[in-house]
Amino acid sequence: MAIKKYKPTSNGRRNMTSLVYKDVITKTTPEKSLLDSQSHSAGRNNAGKMTVRHRGGGNKRQYRIIDFKRIKDDVPATVKAIEYDPNRTANIALLVYADGVKSYIIAPKGLKVGDKVQSGPEADIKTGNALPLKNIPFGTVIHNIELKPGKGGQLVRSAGTSAQLLGKANDEKYVLVRLSSGEVRMVLSVNRATIGAVGNEEHELVNVGKAGRTRWAGQRPHVRGSVMNPNDHPHGGGEGKAPVGLPSPLSPWGKKTVGKKTRSKKNKTEKFIVRHRKGSKM
């Protein structure tokens, strides 16, 4: 997908870039039967109290129902369209199965309109096909990886990401998967994954250019603690541009941050991690 750079007709346009979706997107209106409504809470809970900061506003969106499970085995499907999805960074592909059922999947890199895809243990090792990990050759690039059998893919779903199947673990029940972060993890061999890398890899190269584009996405301004008052943030107060004045930077609630490890060493999933991600010292 090409990247369009705008002329500097204003400060907001200077250095702004965007993706040229017409190069890839073949259908602009979503499939009505695969849409669902979604409400936005602007980061508030049922009591109206803010539980997540920097959320609110943004364009209204309709949720596209994505098939992360891929359990319709041995029924071939044809890719009818590649569509834009405002709810995720990756594009989505509209599939029409041989029995007439329609569904959306995350569009892998290289998948085109007219391609045939299939799921099941006997499916070919081909981009877009979904198989149990035990049926995939070692070294294959995969995405949309399940963590629990039948729950649907949870890992590696963002634009441009991919994982690699490395081999069997000591226990025959598990296989080793290297994630895009560098983490090597044990995953049950009966879990499913989709062949190929997630498409739309140019997404990370886009320069937003102006604050308004992040507001359209439902994100509100992230204010630095050093420009707040002392009663609002531990970094606040002082005359002019004052330093933090503390041994370590703190969060708004007084907890150590910036480099402080937050993952518990007693986490029950720790036993599945063979090697931590790059830069981790846990």
Swiss-Prot record:
GO terms for molecular function: rRNA binding; structural constituent of ribosome; transferase activity. Keywords: Ribonucleoprotein, Ribosomal protein, RNA-binding, rRNA-binding. PROSITE patterns: RIBOSOMAL_L2 (PS00467). The gene is rplB. This is Large ribosomal subunit protein uL2. GO terms for biological process: cytoplasmic translation. One of the primary rRNA binding proteins. Required for association of the 30S and 50S subunits to form the 70S ribosome, for tRNA binding and peptide bond formation. It has been suggested to have peptidyltransferase activity; this is somewhat controversial. Makes several contacts with the 16S rRNA in the 70S ribosome. Signal peptide: none annotated. Residues 35-44 have a biased composition (Polar residues). Part of the 50S ribosomal subunit. Forms a bridge to the 30S subunit in the 70S ribosome. It comes from Levilactobacillus brevis (strain ATCC 367 / BCRC 12310 / CIP 105137 / JCM 1170 / LMG 11437 / NCIMB 947 / NCTC 947) (Lactobacillus brevis). InterPro entries: NA-bd_OB-fold, Rib_uL2_dom2, Ribosomal_uL2, Ribosomal_uL2_bac/org-type, Ribosomal_uL2_C, Ribosomal_uL2_CS, Ribosomal_uL2_dom3, Ribosomal_uL2_RNA-bd_dom. The keyword Iron-sulfur does not apply. It holds the Pfam family Ribosomal_L2_C. Transmembrane segments: none annotated. GO terms for cellular component: large ribosomal subunit. Residues 257-266 have a biased composition (Basic residues). Belongs to the universal ribosomal protein uL2 family. Residues 31-56, 226-282 are annotated as: Disordered.
